[in-house]
């Protein structure tokens, strides 16, 4: 199956698993399965490819070995393309890879499935807002300030970690909360953090409310590792459409597949199908 498909590879040296050793191991694993890479895109030094460029080069498959944020950008850039995208776990949490291939599935096993032809093109539902779409998930509210701690950790900036952790703790405890307005659900005085997880059954929505400093720190640690549900949370529902509003008419901070954006004081969230085929090797969600 693999040898006849012209493939390009997208990598990002800033992603969690994109060390030189990891990239060498990836190329070796691809070669062992006769999957030939015609060109490697080193994002962000190289621009992400678009459908016109890929079609002109005869590319039928793009393999993406990055974190969820770069994956989001790459898949968005390929909207409308008639080829296929293979997602590999090249980041820290690799939530989209989990969705497509299963929890804890290594790159080599995914490539084995591809080589065997044990794949299916799918167009999973995304969670959408005015600033973008999320295939892995959205976080909404002042608690998203913990992303600055994560970035400082990525840069090994210990001073930045300490400073941003203090700011994130303050934002989580005193920042303007957000609440589910349409439909009305949950606490009227809102949540420091709401998580939106897209699936083929719509958007799963969970809210987090701290009961003390220990809960705030627990949730911050969970957020840093992109494991929201390890912190204290409550299920608010499953929706195809909803509106989240600020409790004090302040702009709403969001993380879209881990990347920060700012919305207005009220924001609509809907679902839509991905606009390019992704290769799945597991039943997913």
List PLM regions with ranges:
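Flexible, charged surface loops at secondary-structure boundaries
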Residues: 1-3, 54-58, 129, 172, ...
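Catalytic core of DAGKc-family lipid kinases
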Residues: 10, 40, 80-204
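ATP/NTP phosphate-donor binding region
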Residues: 1-65, 72, 76, 80, ...
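Hydrophobic beta-strand segments of well-ordered beta-sheets in folded domains
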Residues: 5-9, 85, 240-243
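Short His-Asn-centered micro-motif
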Residues: 65-66, 88
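Cofactor-binding loop segments of dinucleotide-utilizing enzymes, especially the Rossmann-like FAD-
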Residues: 12-14, 90, 281
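ATP/nucleoside-binding phosphotransfer catalytic cores, i.e., glycine-rich phosphate-binding loops
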Residues: 209-285
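Short, well-ordered alpha-helix to beta-strand connector turns
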Residues: 59, 82, 191-193, 238-240, ...
């Amino acid at each position: 199956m693999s040898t006849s498909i012209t493939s390009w590879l997208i990598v990002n040296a800033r992603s969690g698993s994109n060390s030189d050793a990891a990239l060498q191991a990836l190329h070796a694993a691809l070669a062992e399965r006769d999957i030939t890479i015609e060109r490697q895109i080193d994002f962000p030094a190289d621009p992400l490819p678009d459908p016109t460029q890929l079609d002109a080069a005869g590319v039928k498959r793009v393999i993406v070995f990055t974190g969820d944020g770069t994956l989001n950008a790459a898949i968005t850039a390929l909207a409308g393309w008639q080829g296929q995208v293979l997602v590999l776990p090249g980041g820290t949490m690799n939530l989209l890879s989990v969705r497509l291939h299963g929890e804890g599935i290594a790159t080599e096993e995914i490539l084995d499935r591809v080589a065997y032809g044990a794949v299916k093109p799918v167009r999973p539902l995304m969670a959408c807002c005015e600033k973008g779409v999320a295939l892995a998930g959205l976080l909404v509210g002042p608690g998203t300030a913990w992303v600055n701690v994560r970035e400082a950790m990525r840069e090994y900036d210990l001073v930045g970690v300490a400073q941003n952790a203090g700011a994130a703790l303050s934002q989580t405890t005193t920042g303007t909360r957000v609440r589910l307005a349409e439909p009305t659900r949950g606490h009227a005085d809102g949540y420091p953090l709401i998580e939106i997880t897209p699936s083929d059954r719509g958007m799963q929505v969970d809210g987090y409310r701290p009961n003390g400093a220990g809960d705030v720190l627990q949730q911050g640690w969970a957020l840093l590792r992109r494991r929201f549900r390890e912190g204290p949370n409550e299920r608010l529902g499953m929706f195809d459409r909803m509106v989240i509003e600020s409790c004090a008419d302040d702009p709403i901070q969001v993380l879209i597949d881990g990347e920060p954006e700012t919305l207005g004081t009220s924001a609509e969230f809907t679902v839509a199908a991905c606009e390019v085929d992704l290769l799945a090797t597991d039943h997913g969600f």
